[in-house]
Amino acid sequence: MSAILASLRHPLIQAPMAFAHDTALPLAVCRAGALGSLAAAMYGPPALEQALQTMWDEGGGLPYNLNFFAHRTPEADEAQRAAWLAVLRPYFDELGLSEGDIPANGGRRPFDADALALLERFRPPVVSFHFGLPAPDLLSRVKAAGCEVWASATTVEEALWLEANGADVVIAQGWEAGGHRGWFLNRNPACQSGLFALLPAVCQAVNLPVVAAGGIADADAVRAALDLGAAAVQAGTAFLLADEALTKPAHRAAIRSARPEDTAVTNLFSGGAARGIVNRFMREAGPMNESALPFPLAGAAAGALKAEAERRGCFDFSPFWAGQGAGRCIPGSAADIVARLCARL
């Protein structure tokens, strides 16, 4: 059993969500008796150091989760880049942008030596990974720092791989989940399962605690996941409506009105498959486009579109990440959301 899971007052984890929160949300979740998560993929070393110092100073010793992406940054040749820019050129022209407006990188950092050095200094109780696990030499140092290692699996095969390669807890991510798919072995959407098919299969396959993730938006879903064998549940979209989240008003409004069919898995915003609320960009260019550069390279040009459109008050190119349970989410403080999700425990 995970010592961290056993220590929680509520078997609930706030999912890490890059851009959607700073330290205020995970701190509030921790104080409410659940496990708050800090998404580190968007932080450079100085900003991550400051965030970890805040978690240390204000966390009161409560456990929290520090999340990283474990991807390996790929290469793209000129032909691939030209094909992706051809998809985006009509939108660039519409907004008066040129290739010179594209930043040098996609903004999503893989776990690296700089992050490891900060982790060894601050020793977060839980370190979780998306897209598999980091290289064995890095992972061994994470474990040597005393951190529990959690990681996402979207299939039974991935769960077994994580168990064999050093994970302490498996997060079973159903197809309903908002944000990026954590897949790393089989990226075929046709092979992905909903949570309530995936969860019992993973629980049966591995000898590790399993956290259920995907479409968890109310107390009934929490209760059902625990009844199917989950040691805890992870909710993301529900916490996008928290008072402490950084979610934009337009994103909040879209979540409140979303039906399950209003979300889709798209690769347009980063090159990685991720579920969000369908917008103009997704309808016209996707939601999946074979010309999108591999994760995270597509995010540089897509991010330029987003930034300029939002500057004009337009959200046609904004990734409003949300799971299929979005419409069942209710706004409130993080403590209110924790209490609401755990009302049937």
Task: Give the ranges of each region predicted by the language model.
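Conserved active-site-proximal phosphate/metal-binding subdomains
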Residues: H180-L185, P189-V211, I216-L345
